[in-house]
Amino acid sequence: LPHFSKSILEALREPLEDNKILISRVNSKIMYETKFIFIAAMNPCPCGNLLSSLKECRCNELEIQRYKNRLSEPCLDRIDLYVVMNDSFSDNKNIVSSKELHENVIKAFSKQKNRGQKELNGKLSEEDIKRYCILDDEAKEILEKARLNYQLTFRSINKVLKVARTIADLNDNEI
């Protein structure tokens, strides 16, 4: 992801946030709907070995910071989920088969539809988040601590709620 130009990365902000993009030309403007799943990858550092247990990182702190800073905070704020991938070894006993995963996703979609949602969790509006992502007092307290500790923006809090709702649906839980 950081290897794309800054202008391309910043151009992703509108479609990621608003599900639309405005193309302006000399005499006209055209609005296109942009419903898509954004999946991206980046190394933890320029050499790619920062989190490796097998190889040594060759980067200094300045290089790592410069690499990470290629993505602006507003751009990062529009990404729903970050997953850090460590070295993987085949002795993991918690592997879920593709078939099981597929079945869980279908059940989660059905659960969302039965709840009356017009959109999947990832595309819920602010109003729908309040309707479908209901937290008990303990969850509210945990979210407030996270907001303060990680300086979460309003947008980030909504993303946390949508991801939590999705995880709950996949695990067949209410919340």
Q: Model features per residue range: what roles?
A:
Residues 1-4:
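Conserved Walker B
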Residues 6-175:
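Basic, amphipathic alpha-helical bundle interface domains used for macromolecular binding and assembly
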